[in-house]
Amino acid sequence: MLPSTIQTLTLFLTSGGVLLSLYVSASLSYLLYSDILLKFSSKITAPTMTLDCANASNVQAVNRSATKEMTFLLPEPEWTYPRLSCQGSTFQKALLISPHRFGEARGNSAPLIIREPFIACGPKECKHFALTHYAAQPGGYYNGTREDRNKLRHLISVKLGKIPTVENSIFHMAAWSGSACHDGREWTYIGVDGPDSNALIKIKYGEAYTDTYHSYANNILRTQESACNCIGGDCYLMITDGSASGISKCRFLKIREGRIIKEIFPTGRVEHTEECTCGFASNKTIECACRDNSYTAKRPFVKLNVETDTAEIRLMCTETYLDTPRPDDGSITGPCESNGDKGRGGIKGGFVHQRMASKIGRWYSRTMSKTERMGMELYVRYDGDPWTDSDALAHSGVMVSMKEPGWYSFGFEIKDKKCDVPCIGIEMVHDGGKKTWHSAATAIYCLMGSGQLLWDTVTGVDMAL
């Protein structure tokens, strides 16, 4: 790899080591020596020396210094690739971000009103993203905070573990739908906004706004509401455009350093695919568990080959139906592609891979309630093919009880030194209806250790206070 970052440092050298001149006044200087062995090519230039003495006739100046200019070549950070998952056989509660437990704070310390949270990680840090209504609680701008789309919504982030307050949050761009991912060198941010009939995807790479993508069905162009996925500098983003109660065909955008370099048009069962949660099954394949808001309670499942840039969609065949609302498990008859009933409506689902040397685990989340966005459970299936395996998924534990809200969920992976830690995040919405504020907490569960998932999460928020 050829480095592209070149930094030039000029050091003043003497025979004993490195000489740093610190000018304390117009006529005084102090010399600091350190023993450093430097092995770089250099060039010598004539020095400049100024003497300022009260009795210059009694001073003999001997110049034994020279200016030595050296060029340090700093390599670019490496592109990221999926690695084996860190060891573990169960998920445990890792973190709760419940901003409105601090709802008595005002001003810059006030928590932002948010929804659609997700988490994305780079090599050195994870960021907690969300879509804010440009309002805080407490405050006077609660009206409209239950709306999905308006002109005030923005994609924001904080470092994972920070509370998304006015003071802590970075505002990335105007957006009512969003995604983000890190390619190993820089962050890519995705935001969608505009009128329903002509929405626009905007891409930001680092601090620069770099590209756009226009609506292709003129019916609420939108994206994942979770992290996009990068390998070798290429980042893959799922988008869709179409009716919430009819046809909505998805596409994938291949993005490199903030610019779209290819469109991918999936084949197969393409009638309705939205809000995909995606991750790497291997260095060759991205898999996504998605939402069909129109026809079925089964999840559309995408396999995207990053070597050929082709994608295919089929319905998950398991008798454990993962959408909400949904019929009784196992009640849909016929082949795997059968839609069944209770397919209208839906919810974004959590999905993450556990990559092991000899097998792969696929972890999923779904609400405990079959009809309401309440509770959240964890399921797993090792190996097999989600397109053809009809058996029930293995139940792994309760992350959110039936008494607590369980709305959107998502997957992400934390980068350890030599392996990746799979995690699932859960949006726990404080639903105040249309008369007061409407916002969310985030619960996080990660793979760690063995045994059973031990404890569920509560938000601890009373909206009446």
UniProtKB/Swiss-Prot annotation:
Membrane-spanning ranges: 12-34
Annotated stretches, region: Involved in apical transport and lipid raft association: 13-35
Keywords for the protein's UniProt record, in alphabetical order: Calcium, Disulfide bond, Glycoprotein, Glycosidase, Host cell membrane, Host membrane, Hydrolase, Membrane, Metal-binding, Signal-anchor, Transmembrane, Transmembrane helix, Virion
Main location: virion
UniProt cross-references to Gene3D superfamilies, sorted A to Z: 2.120.10.10
A Pfam family matched in the record: Neur
Cofactor(s), by name: Ca(2+)
Post-translational modification remark: N-glycosylated.
Activity control note: Inhibited by the neuraminidase inhibitors zanamivir (Relenza) and oseltamivir (Tamiflu). These drugs interfere with the release of progeny virus from infected cells and are effective against all influenza strains. Resistance to neuraminidase inhibitors is quite rare.
InterPro entries in UniProt: Glyco_hydro_34 (IPR001860), Sialidase_Influenza_A/B (IPR033654), Sialidase_sf (IPR036278)
Active site: 148, 408
Database matches in SUPFAM superfamilies: Sialidases
Domain of life: Viruses
CDD domains recorded: Influenza_NA
Cofactor detail note: Binds 1 Ca(2+) ion per subunit.
Disulfide bonds: 86-419, 121-126, 181-228, 230-235, 276-290, 278-288, 317-336, 423-446
Intravirion side: 1-11
GO molecular function: exo-alpha-sialidase activity; metal ion binding
This enzyme's EC code(s): 3.2.1.18
Family label: Belongs to the glycosyl hydrolase 34 family.
Domain characteristics, as noted in the entry: Intact N-terminus is essential for virion morphogenesis. Possesses two apical sorting signals, one in the ectodomain, which is likely to be a glycan, and the other in the transmembrane domain. The transmembrane domain also plays a role in lipid raft association.
Descriptive protein name: Neuraminidase
Organism, scientific name: Influenza B virus (strain B/Beijing/1/1987)
Lineage: Viruses, Riboviria, Orthornavirae, Negarnaviricota, Polyploviricotina
